[in-house]
UniProtKB/Swiss-Prot annotation:
Pfam families: Ribosomal_S14. InterPro entries: Ribosomal_uS14, Ribosomal_uS14_bac/plastid, Ribosomal_uS14_sf. One of its GO terms (molecular function) is structural constituent of ribosome. Part of the 30S ribosomal subunit. Contacts proteins S3 and S10. Keywords: Ribonucleoprotein, Ribosomal protein, RNA-binding, rRNA-binding. GO terms for biological process: translation. Binds 16S rRNA, required for the assembly of 30S particles and may also be responsible for determining the conformation of the 16S rRNA at the A site. This is Small ribosomal subunit protein uS14. GO terms for cellular component: cytoplasm; small ribosomal subunit. Belongs to the universal ribosomal protein uS14 family.
């Protein structure tokens, strides 16, 4: 389980990205890099980390499912992920 402060920081970044998305796109299109540089650092989508929705783990996350590899395997074996089954050939 990730620290709650790390999860909260990432959620704050997600909100900032949403808040400044339109302004950032306009400035980028206009080529106003000086104004773009003055925006908050955390308003850049690059700083957002994909995290597991259950554990907060930041590495080994399947973005399509929003789960880390451990939880993905657990739920897949329990049959809780529709359409996912263990490969066999």
């Amino acid at each position: 389980m990730a620290k709650k402060s790390v999860i909260a920081r990432n959620e704050k970044r997600i909100k900032l990205v949403a808040k400044y998305a339109v302004l950032r796109a306009e400035l980028l299109k206009a080529g106003d890099y000086e104004a773009l540089r003055k925006l908050p650092r955390d308003s850049s989508a690059t700083r957002v980390r994909n995290r597991c929705v259950l554990t907060g783990r930041g590495r080994g996350v399947y973005a399509k499912y929003g789960l880390c590899r451990h939880m993905f395997r657990k739920f897949a074996l329990e049959g809780k992920l529709p359409g996912v089954k263990k490969a066999s050939w």
